């Protein structure tokens, strides 16, 4: 129970500050923001709270509240809060803070105790009395909702001095932990995702399990635990057939134990006699050591082992027993990146305890053991482990036997890869492991071998490779019981994205309220002319290349997500209204170009407590915040508030304005910045003090007469975005000239082009 030990609710009042019983805090609205938002870059759960009567009672006015809460959650002392030091949150409680803020910290602490640490949370008042918006970092929505419910229950108990003990706190933590285990990524997948995040590679979960996309669009790679896009289905099938694997390895000079596939227990004994005792009996297509019995020397043992192995696989194999230690070598992309050594698990009798009791006291009490994937060692369950029961029977014991004091009882002979030995692997052993993975056809493989000393070649010690496993578990290397953890997640990430490849495609985000759909279409048109298969999500629909595949309003998170998972897409343009950012967050984590056209539209956002245009700065700055360091923000210099977002950008800034006298332009150009503006009825590209006309595009008066649906500001923003993306200037000018502003005309033009011979020059869809 750790930090929860001894936590109790104080049952007596210690002062006369307030003895009122309070109604529950009402949770008015719960919303999961799946991408960057006005709060943070990461997904958060946003909760609208109505404190009711508690609005008039901060924490220092509720009798005994701080003592009760800190007794229940002692680790709150570690929360710095806004004070910036240990004990900061306790100081805020003592001085007086409101219950919405307290709930934020309670939920965060429950997540920490459940093994999903988070340090981010905020609580802000709204324009309505007693109503607050509270958010906290949420890597999984369902986990966050359970943590919120449990935290709400705990907080109200502490406020009202209701019975709530350490046991109740532990139940709350267990409920959150159970949801983590049920919903969140397994440890192997999480390690790879974490390594990708460290490298700045985005990830997207594709199902409720461990299927994850790393990167975007055409540059993505997918993983499923330790299987990747490069993992061969044929290789997996070969690895699952142990006899075929051995045959292929032997033909390539890899040492393997001789063996035979048998159909029944009698054949198993005959094979054992042919091979020579002792032998191993195991399933031909199982893994993780299931159903494997080692060092069998008698007919009875072999036949009993057959009965253990048969339910675990389609066939049963009998192999020569190789003396030595079990080892697991992890091969990634033709290199051994980690190795672990197994150990025989034993208990020692005390003359009083049964074998079952010794297992509980000496083995299962080890904090490294657990039933969940996060533990490096498994719990040992005697009642359901036929292999263990057979092992005890070989020693003339069972679970109820009481071994004499000092007697060592073998519990498990294999499957306990707990000790890191990566630095000890001999180069010839590593070569054999890499060759085995290559022969089977796996980019990532767990190579099981037996050797007396992993630091010496296999041949002289008669060592051998006994299995090649597809989709190997990584936990033994991430959390070895003995030795140093190995960065296997990073090794797999580097294998998938060599040479520091970011896994990204050009992403252009368009934020604002005025003419943003046609602007997004024009940008997508120019990118497509530049040679990239382009996806577009905007209010006019969802487009792949020049085809509209969905006519519904697609300026939202779901439509953007559809583009980013599409392997055919080489660039995307996504329109983001303020409501999209407030309701869902952005569909992407970072972008190469972020465009902000204006800060209008507050009147439509009253449901989000946005009532003034000045509040839009906090919302639409999100688009600027996510621009990559090597990217560009394209900002409307005609609106000083939009131009004022420039310092928030990690990358470069291009300003645009129809009025060349816009105040922001002069200062920006004087500092050497780029700008797109209008002079002499022409589009001008400015780089510091140097200016030139955009080639390929003539007088704007003529152009605007034939492109009625495109505002001058949208034209300038699109030119700036294309310039930032490195599209040739003459192609930008020609593309703007050829753009079909009217959507229906563009759709009709595309339909017509599809009925003509390929050589017919037809206007294509923007």
Residue ranges and their predicted role:
Residues 504, 583-765:
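Acidic, Mg2+-coordinating active-site environments of NTP-dependent enzymes
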Residues 2-198, 335-338, 343-350, 354-357, ...:
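ATP-dependent carboxylate activation and anion-phosphoryl transfer catalytic cores
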Residues 547-584, 596:
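Conserved nucleotide-sensing/catalytic segment adjacent to the nucleotide-binding pocket
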Residues 196, 448, 537, 575, ...:
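Residue-level signal for inorganic ion chemistry
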Residues 358-416:
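Extended, charge-rich helix/loop segments that form flexible
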Residues 20, 221-380, 427-430, 489:
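Active-site nucleotide/adenylate-binding loops and adjacent lid/helix of ATP-dependent enzymes
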Residues 499-545:
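Walker A (P-loop) phosphate-binding motif
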Residues 129-131, 135-274, 287:
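Conserved N-proximal alpha/beta basic substrate-recognition cap immediately N-terminal to
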């Amino acid at each position: 129970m750790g930090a929860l030990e001894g936590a109790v609710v104080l049952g007596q009042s210690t002062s006369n500050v307030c003895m009122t019983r309070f109604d529950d805090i009402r949770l008015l609205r719960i919303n999961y923001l799946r991408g960057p938002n006005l709060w943070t870059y990461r997904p958060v759960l946003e909760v609208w709270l109505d404190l009711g009567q508690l609005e008039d009672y901060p924490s220092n006015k509720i009798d005994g509240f701080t003592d009760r809460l800190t007794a229940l959650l002692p680790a709150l002392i570690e929360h710095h809060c806004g004070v910036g030091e240990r004990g900061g949150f306790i100081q805020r409680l003592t001085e007086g803070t409101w219950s919405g803020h307290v709930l934020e910290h309670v939920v965060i602490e429950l997540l920490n105790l459940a093994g999903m640490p988070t340090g981010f949370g905020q609580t802000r008042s709204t324009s309505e009395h007693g109503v607050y918006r509270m958010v906290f970092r949420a890597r999984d929505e369902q986990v966050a909702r359970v943590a919120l419910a449990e935290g709400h229950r705990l907080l109200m108990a502490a406020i009202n001095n209701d019975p709530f003990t350490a046991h109740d706190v532990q139940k709350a933590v267990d409920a959150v932990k159970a949801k983590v285990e049920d919903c969140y990524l397994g440890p192997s997948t999480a390690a790879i995702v974490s390594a990708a995040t460290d490298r700045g590679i985005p990830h997207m979960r594709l199902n409720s399990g461990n299927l994850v996309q790393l990167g975007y669009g055409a540059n993505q790679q997918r993983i499923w635990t330790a299987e990747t896009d490069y993992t061969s289905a044929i290789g997996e099938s070969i690895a699952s057939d142990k006899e075929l694997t051995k045959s292929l390895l032997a033909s390539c000079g890899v040492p393997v134990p001789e063996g035979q596939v048998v159909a029944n227990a009698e054949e198993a004994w005959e094979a054992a006699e042919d091979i020579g005792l002792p032998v191993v009996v195991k399933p031909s297509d199982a893994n993780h050591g299931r159903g494997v019995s080692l060092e069998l020397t008698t007919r009875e043992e072999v036949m009993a082992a057959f009965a253990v192995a048969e339910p675990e696989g389609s066939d049963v194999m009998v192999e020569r027993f190789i003396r030595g230690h079990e080892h697991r070598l992890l091969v990634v992309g033709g290199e051994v990146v980690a190795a672990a050594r197994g150990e025989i698990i034993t208990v020692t009798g005390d003359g009083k305890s049964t074998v079952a009791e010794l297992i509980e006291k000496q083995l299962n009490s080890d904090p490294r053991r657990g039933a969940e994937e996060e533990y490096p060692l498994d719990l040992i369950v005697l009642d359901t482990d036929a292999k263990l029961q057979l092992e005890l029977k070989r020693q003339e014991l069972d679970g109820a036997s009481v071994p004499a004091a000092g007697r060592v009882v073998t519990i498990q002979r294999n499957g306990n890869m707990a000790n890191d030995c990566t630095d000890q692997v001999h180069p010839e052993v590593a070569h054999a492991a890499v060759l085995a993975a290559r022969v089977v056809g796996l980019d990532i493989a767990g190579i099981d071998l037996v050797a007396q000393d992993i630091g010496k070649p296999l041949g002289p010690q008669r060592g051998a490779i006994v299995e090649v496993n597809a989709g190997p578990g990584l936990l033994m290397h991430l959390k070895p019981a003995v030795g140093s953890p190995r960065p296997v997640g990073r090794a797999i990430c580097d294998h998938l994205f060599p040479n520091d490849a970011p896994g990204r495609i050009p992403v252009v985000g368009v934020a604002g309220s005025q003419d943003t759909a046609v602007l997004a279409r024009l940008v997508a048109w120019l990118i497509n002319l530049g040679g990239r298969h382009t996806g577009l999500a905007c209010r006019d629909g969802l487009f792949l290349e020049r085809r509209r595949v969905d006519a519904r309003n697609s300026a939202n998170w779901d439509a953007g997500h559809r583009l980013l998972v599409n392997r055919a897409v080489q660039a995307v343009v996504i329109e983001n209204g303020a409501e999209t950012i407030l309701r869902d967050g952005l569909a992407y984590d970072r972008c190469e170009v972020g465009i902000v056209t204006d800060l209008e539209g507050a009147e439509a956002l009253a449901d989000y407590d946005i009532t003034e245009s000045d509040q839009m700065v906090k919302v639409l700055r999100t688009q600027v915040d996510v621009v990559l360091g090597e990217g560009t923000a394209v900002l409307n210099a005609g609106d000083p508030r939009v131009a004022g977002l420039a310092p928030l950008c990690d990358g470069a800034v291009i300003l645009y304005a129809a009025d060349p006298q816009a105040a922001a332009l002069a200062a920006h150009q004087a500092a050497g910045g780029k700008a797109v503006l209008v002079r002499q009825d022409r589009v001008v590209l400015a780089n510091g003090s140097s200016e030139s006309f955009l080639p390929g595009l003539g007088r704007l008066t003529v152009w605007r007469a034939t492109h009625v649906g495109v505002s001058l500001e949208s034209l300038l923003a699109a030119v700036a975005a294309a310039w930032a993306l490195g599209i040739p200037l003459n192609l930008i000018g020609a593309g703007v000239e050829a753009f079909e502003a009217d959507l229906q005309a563009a759709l009709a033009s595309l339909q017509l082009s599809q009925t003509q011979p390929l050589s017919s020059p037809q206007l294509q869809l923007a």
